[in-house]
Amino acid sequence: MGLPWYRVHTVVLNDPGRLLAVHIMHTALVSGWAGSMALYELAVFDPSDPVLDPMWRQGMFVIPFMTRLGITNSWGGWSITGGTITNPGIWSYEGVAGAHIVFSGLCFLAAIWHWVYWDLQIFCDERTGKPSLDLPKIFGIHLFLSGLACFGFGAFHVTGLYGPGIWVSDPYGLTGKVQSVNPAWGVEGFDPFVPGGIASHHIAAGTLGILAGLFHLSVRPPQRLYKGLRMGNIETVLSSSIAAVFFAAFVVAGTMWYGSATTPIELFGPTRYQWDQGYFQQEIYRRVGAGLAENKSLSDVWSKIPEKLAFYDYIGNNPAKGGLFRAGSMDNGDGIAVGWLGHPIFRDKEGRELFVRRMPTFFETFPVVLVDGDGIVRADVPFRRAESKYSVEQVGVTVEFYGGELDGVSYSDPATVKKYARRAQLGEIFELDRATLKSDGVFRSSPRGWFTFGHASFALLFFFGHIWHGARTLFRDVFAGIDPDLDAQVEFGAFQKLGDPTTKRQVV
């Protein structure tokens, strides 16, 4: 039978044993990829600076997912939060990777066994002696088991009752750690940034899944519904499964891109909207304002700003700045961050404090414009010097740094002032090492961007797959040219008027 490549799955259409085999093999491939990818990432990951060179800057993709579920230690003696450890235990990063690879091998062997021994008694219909699957019962079994797993995850793993808990952090991604979470049963549980909602929703959804599974195991579908939804056709299962997968993919693409308690910024990097809304900048200025209200000096209050918070307020960490087809980690783009130079404050010769307008997300170049506290333009770096009125030289702009490596240093040289004004467009100013990785200076996206793009793309593809297979199973008889009234239509003289079923001849 010469099947084209896009129809090869036809061979398992009426073969339950080998249908099971190919699904087990698929699980083996997925699990094997996850374990292998984890080992590769651990081989290239540098845990030495969790503040300025975190996992998301290094382009780690599977390590963040392990970390948010409670894995923080490595057999290499390091912890993701910094420092060294002596007893990481079996459930370290390497332990999880190894477990996936072992599981992959077992699934591989099981798939081969089920491929060879495909003609099992369990798949045989006693009445007909032909291979058959009781799909409604299988649906009930899967619903019950997945509900059990969902409930167990929410009630035991997340709450810490039997498990480590999950990664929980503050709104600014500064104090993150793995901890147990109490379920949030009030309206606050519907806030996507409240970790307690993860526990309560898994418990609730798991309970519903268990009850629904038991219902489908004990109640048979009505005949009309069974036939109407084509419940006896395996392609119905394929269509509805694809629907579940694409719906989940759309949901997680949204929670990843817009941010939620399930996608902490310490593990996946900031969202683009935190740059667009000046989220971290506002918090920095709030802290500075609070310090100044206590009569502390500018140098003191800016020195108290956590380097981690300042680093979030840098456009190079915006996932929307990197092109989708620019391969490599963020570190391969603008370089490895070495240190915060401090916060630059610009002043004109009249002593007014000036603020550099920040570059919007979707600009590659942007004019350097300095405004005062009222938003009035006071200085710029002109495109045409002959017509300039507000150039740094004419206005006499100076810059002084507070906090960071250049604390207390000031510059009045126009070339230096303009250099730092340009860099201030990109947020807080950092020293970046571009030599180590031969970084090219072109911004890259973070794993947050890759995950969103991948899942949104596949969700769209799977949506069309759902429509395709759903239509095939619902209209299978029509596509095959089989119509319930076909025999009556072609019978000579069946209708008084050819093809008009309302004029059926009466038998005398």
Swiss-Prot record:
GO terms for cellular component: chloroplast thylakoid membrane; photosystem II. Its main location: plastid. It comes from the Eukaryota. Keywords: Chlorophyll, Chloroplast, Chromophore, Membrane, Photosynthesis, Photosystem II, Plastid, Thylakoid, Transmembrane, Transmembrane helix. GO terms for biological process: photosynthetic electron transport in photosystem II. Disulfide bonds: none annotated. The keyword Chloroplast applies. Binds multiple chlorophylls. PSII binds additional chlorophylls, carotenoids and specific lipids. The keyword Plastid applies. Pfam families: PSII (PF00421). The chain crosses the membrane at residues 21-36, 101-115, 140-156, 203-218, 237-252, 457-472. It is a multi-pass membrane protein. InterPro entries: PS_antenna-like, PS_II_antenna-like_sf, PSII_PsbB. GO terms for molecular function: chlorophyll binding; electron transporter, transferring electrons within the cyclic electron transport pathway of photosynthesis activity. It is found in: Plastid, Chloroplast thylakoid membrane. Belongs to the PsbB/PsbC family. PsbB subfamily. HAMAP family: PSII_PsbB_CP47. One of the components of the core complex of photosystem II (PSII). It binds chlorophyll and helps catalyze the primary light-induced photochemical processes of PSII. PSII is a light-driven water:plastoquinone oxidoreductase, using light energy to abstract electrons from H(2)O, generating O(2) and a proton gradient subsequently used for ATP formation. PSII is composed of 1 copy each of membrane proteins PsbA, PsbB, PsbC, PsbD, PsbE, PsbF, PsbH, PsbI, PsbJ, PsbK, PsbL, PsbM, PsbT, PsbX, PsbY, PsbZ, Psb30/Ycf12, at least 3 peripheral proteins of the oxygen-evolving complex and a large number of cofactors. It forms dimeric complexes. PANTHER family: PHOTOSYSTEM II CP43 REACTION CENTER PROTEIN, PHOTOSYSTEM II CP47 REACTION CENTER PROTEIN. This is Photosystem II CP47 reaction center protein. It comes from Ranunculus macranthus (Large buttercup). The lineage of its organism: Eukaryota, Viridiplantae, Streptophyta, Embryophyta, Tracheophyta. The gene is psbB.
